[in-house]
């Protein structure tokens, strides 16, 4: 029975991402009508309405690459990356989907693509 102390090495600070991944699944719709001003997002790791309610009011962003580079205000280098910002308004259904409204409507080419759900503003 040797009492050897195990030397613990301090772990490196882990830098995680500050957003939750979501998939743009479509627009809010009825049987024959579609509302392009409201998008439906399926959040990764969220499976019920109560968990989806936590994300109400959080900011969302759709990042995409454009054809031409432009210089944004406050930056010194031109980039092709563009962003469309929005906000989660409420849960949708019972399976963890949410509704989001964007400042400019999301293009249909974004169906099935990634959306970032930022964890601010925080309500905890």
UniProtKB/Swiss-Prot annotation:
Keywords attached to this Swiss-Prot or TrEMBL record, sorted alphabetically, are: Acetylation, Ribonucleoprotein, Ribosomal protein
Domain of life, source organism: Eukaryota
A GO CC term assigned to this protein in UniProt: cytosolic large ribosomal subunit
According to the UniProt entry, which residues carry N-acetylalanine? Answer: 2
Q: Name one GO molecular function term.
A: structural constituent of ribosome
Sorted alphabetically, which Pfam families does this protein's record hold? Ribosomal_L35Ae
Q: Which residue ranges run through the membrane?
A: none
Keyword Magnesium assigned: no
Quote the PROSITE patterns the UniProt record gives: RIBOSOMAL_L35AE (PS01105)
GO biological process terms on file: cytoplasmic translation; ribosomal large subunit biogenesis
Q: Which InterPro entries match?
A: Ribosomal_eL33, Ribosomal_eL33_CS, Ribosomal_eL33_sf, Transl_B-barrel_sf
Give the family this protein belongs to, as stated in its UniProt record. Belongs to the eukaryotic ribosomal protein eL33 family.
PANTHER family per the record? 60S RIBOSOMAL PROTEIN L35A
- What is the protein name given in its UniProt record? Large ribosomal subunit protein eL33
Protein species of origin: Caenorhabditis elegans
């Amino acid at each position: 029975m040797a009492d050897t102390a195990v030397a613990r090495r301090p772990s490196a600070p882990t830098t995680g991402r500050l957003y939750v991944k979501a998939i743009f699944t479509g627009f809010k719709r009825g049987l024959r009508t579609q509302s392009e001003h409201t998008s439906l997002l399926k959040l990764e790791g969220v499976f019920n309405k109560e968990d989806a309610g936590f994300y109400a009011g959080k900011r969302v962003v759709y990042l995409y690459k454009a054809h031409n580079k432009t210089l944004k205000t406050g930056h010194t280098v031109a980039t092709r990356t563009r962003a469309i910002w929005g906000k989660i308004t409420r849960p949708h259904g019972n399976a963890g989907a949410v509704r989001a409204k964007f400042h400019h409507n999301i293009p249909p080419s974004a169906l099935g693509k990634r959306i970032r759900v930022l964890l601010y503003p925080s309500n905890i």
